[in-house]
Amino acid sequence: GGSAPAVLNAANEVAVAAFLGARLAFDRIPELIEHTLEGVAVIPLSSIEDVFAADEAARECAQLWLARNAEGVLQEPLRIPA
């Protein structure tokens, strides 16, 4: 409950973007999400500002994890046809 869904969503968005950008292997997506869920405090949400704050904290935590743990995994970013 609380801010956990916002944290989960933000971590997932960062992880998928990193995967599509060839910075994160697909099988490491859960690791990044788990780290973010453990690293960002879950708080009760009483306003939309609380949701935005949880999202921002989660994205920052996930980006820090990426900076320390990600490596170039693919030769080039994944291209998804339109």
Task: List the model feature ranges, each with a label.
Residues G1-A82:
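Catalytic, metal-anchored helix/loop core of enzyme active sites in primary metabolism
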